[in-house]
């Protein structure tokens, strides 16, 4: 029997380096992960450079690569992908931005870049979206809430450019920056002016909004300024189904990953960071009943890597492992398990270390690897591959590859 469906499970930031607090083991080596070890034992393993050796991939560029989209061709910035993930219908040529609500004091200085980690911005985001008027520029806006203090902005109109800076000072105690053009074009100068006007009007709307007045009355930071960054022009993507001849869905709590999936035509299945892992797995299984392919991203390991919390990262990997049991009951499934990049706790940042990879399903050759970790997988039968090779290998394993030559 040959597998016929693909699950691409990306444990965000899974790769690591030896951690002293773990006895010089990586979190994967220290974790008790019997299900992942079983997948490794019954499958074929290797290590993978998500983009290329020595390249520290972002979650955006790496996911594009793993889905078969060369980031050197398709990547136009994080902003439009984040905007798509927040539910904005991004069209080619629209300019997308990442956004954060923050708090400024009476002197205009930023005192909290996350507005006291405000849990929900739906109401104030709607007020900004409906209240900001850029019609004198011939520009329409889309503004959508993300999780917590996050949001996304998109601009639509003629003569726009993504070559603009950010108003985010990236520190407290100073005022938000004025947005400037990043090149000498009239389009960049025009877009910078539009962005500054958006920021000015948004701050006026937020200043006395009831939500913020209530937060101040409770002694909480008001969300009274919008910081935008990561400008990018929405590109043109060949759909995943056209490219790979597979129908597909994306299950990801991270807006960026959901946005990447929806941008290439995968159906977005909404989940929240608070959605339990077993419920996310249930949704993945439901989608696999209807679709040929599911991209399933779990994010928290990456966050613990950025925070330098090796013990917590280890425990989270054990939680992921425990949620995987239902996939063993799907004999038609080809499972690929990997990371989009390494996020070592020792450096609290993405690194270029290759990530461990498992391919499990009927039709795979079985190697001698019995553990899922960075060192064990390096001895596997896949050896070392690039992220751009992953989809072609998976398509071959489910007998969807077209012959090259006669």
UniProtKB/Swiss-Prot annotation:
InterPro entries associated with the record: Alkaline_phosphatase_core_sf (IPR017850), ApgAM_prokaryotes (IPR023665), Metalloenzyme (IPR006124), Pglycerate_mutase_ApgM (IPR004456)
The annotated pathway is:
Carbohydrate degradation; glycolysis; pyruvate from D-glyceraldehyde 3-phosphate: step 3/5
Q: Which reaction does it catalyse?
A: (2R)-2-phosphoglycerate = (2R)-3-phosphoglycerate
State which Enzyme Commission number(s) the record gives.
Answer: 5.4.2.12
| Region listing for Disordered, in residue ranges | 164-184
The reply on keyword Magnesium is no
Gene3D superfamilies on file: Alkaline Phosphatase, subunit A
Keyword Isomerase recorded: yes
* Keyword annotations: Glycolysis, Isomerase
Q: Name one GO biological process term.
A: glycolytic process
Give GO MF terms, alphabetically.
metal ion binding; phosphoglycerate mutase activity
Q: Which domain of life is it from?
A: Archaea
CDD domains named among the record's database cross-references: iPGM_like
Protein family: Belongs to the BPG-independent phosphoglycerate mutase family. A-PGAM subfamily.
Q: Please give the NCBIfam families that the UniProt record associates with this protein.
A: apgM (TIGR00306), PRK04024.1 (NF003104)
Physiological role: Catalyzes the interconversion of 2-phosphoglycerate and 3-phosphoglycerate.
Q: What is this protein called?
A: 2,3-bisphosphoglycerate-independent phosphoglycerate mutase
- Species name: Methanocorpusculum labreanum (strain ATCC 43576 / DSM 4855 / Z)
